[in-house]
From Swiss-Prot:
Protein's UniProt keywords contain Acetylation: no
Cited NCBIfam families: PRK00142.1-3
InterPro entries in UniProt: Rhodanese-like_dom (IPR001763), Rhodanese-like_dom_sf (IPR036873), Rhodanese_C (IPR022111), TrhO (IPR020936), TRHO_N (IPR040503)
Single GO BP term: tRNA modification
Catalytic residues, chain numbering: 179
GO molecular function: oxidoreductase activity, acting on paired donors, with incorporation or reduction of molecular oxygen
Top-rank taxon: Bacteria
EC code: 1.14.-.-
Lineage, opening ranks: Bacteria, Bacillati, Bacillota, Bacilli, Lactobacillales
Gene expressing this chain: trhO
PROSITE patterns, sorted: RHODANESE_3
Family: Belongs to the TrhO family.
Record-given protein name: tRNA uridine(34) hydroxylase
Length: 319
């Protein structure tokens, strides 16, 4: 008999006094329930993804709802074949979302207008609307809303500077923004309002909610949604599946993520199993020949085998 598992994604902006002590106690509670996952706690709130059996996840939601600070917390629930995490971590951080701002934004005081999935879809179709993806580049590359702008950033904290450098092209437009579950957009949309953007909207509940809406059914989403657990990719569009990801090495359609074999690089890239083997699991020649290449170690390749593959690769690239 197979065990049914679930993955819970949630966040709540709410003041938490002595966040460090709360994080320690919350870790004990999660372990007692048998959960696995990753939770961030800050003085400004909580953000987590946890997985476990139906019984365990139900118990966790009850635990949270019994705390007056989290009675309004919305849990996005995904069915899963197995645990999405190997361990349970609860960590304290100074803030849940880092935009590297001198004067941080409090979403409880300033944030963009909330749009439900149907409203967001309708707004995307307006020609006077621009849609800005508030996630990292590797998340966008796996999947995104059709026509969305891809900021040239490697991390969320680089987004404000990118907006400042490019704001002239959409300052007078209606600006919509979205992210995985909604937490990043709460701050980012508030910052856009503070920067002087007149009409700012955010996808309430994020992509995760959009994909489950029975009417919208993930329409206008291409690719898959990147998630920060062992699943990596989650389907969103229930009407059609358009692959937008491209293999790092040959540009062919691909939705399989790997990390560069060089632990000092660790770049996330899309690659087929064939290309991962051909290129020794590394994004560049420098990373392929790195002495700690994890792909070479994991597959126990001898030095002779490595040299033979490198020679074949050099010949192929030269042709």
């Amino acid at each position: 008999m197979t065990q049914d598992y679930r993955v819970l994604l949630y966040y709540q902006y709410v003041p938490i006094e002595d966040g460090e002590s709360f994080a320690q106690k919350h870790l004990s509670d999660c372990k007692a329930l048998g959960l696995k996952g990753r939770i961030l706690v800050a003085d400004e709130g909580i953000n987590g993804t946890v997985s476990g059996t139906v019984e365990q996840t139900n118990a966790y939601m009850s635990l949270m709802k019994n705390d007056s600070r989290f009675t309004s917390t919305i849990f996005k629930i995904d069915e899963a074949k197995q645990n999405a995490f190997k361990k349970m971590h609860v960590r304290y951080r100074p803030e849940l979302v880092n935009l590297s701002l001198e004067d941080d934004v409090n979403p409880l005081e300033l944030t963009g207008a909330y749009l439900d999935p149907k409203e967001f879809r309708e707004a995307m179709l307006d020609e006077n609307t621009v849609v800005i993806d508030a996630r990292n580049d590797y998340e966008f590359d796996l999947g995104h809303f059709r026509g969305a702008i891809r900021p040239e950033i490697r991390s969320f904290r680089e987004l404000p500077q990118w907006i400042r450098d490019n704001k002239e092209q959409f300052m007078e437009k209606r600006v919509l923004t979205y992210c995985t579950g909604g937490i990043r957009c709460e701050k980012f949309s508030g910052w856009l309002v503070r920067e002087g953007f007149k009409d700012v909207g955010q996808l309430h509940g994020g992509i995760a909610t959009y994909g489950k809406d029975p009417e919208v059914q993930g329409d206008l989403w291409d690719g898959q949604m990147y998630v920060f657990d062992s699943r990596i990719a989650v389907p969103i569009n229930q009407k059609e599946h358009v692959i937008v990801g491209r293999d790092w090495f040959d540009g062919s359609p691909c939705e399989r993520y790997i990390n560069c074999g060089n632990p000092e690089c660790n770049r996330q890239m899309l690659a087929s199993k064939e290309n991962e083997a051909k290129y020794l699991g590394a994004c560049s020649h420098e990373c392929r020949v790195h002495p700690d290449n994890r792909y070479i170690k994991a597959h126990q390749l001898s030095n002779q085998e490595v040299q033979e593959r490198l020679a074949l690769l050099e010949k192929d690239l030269a042709s």
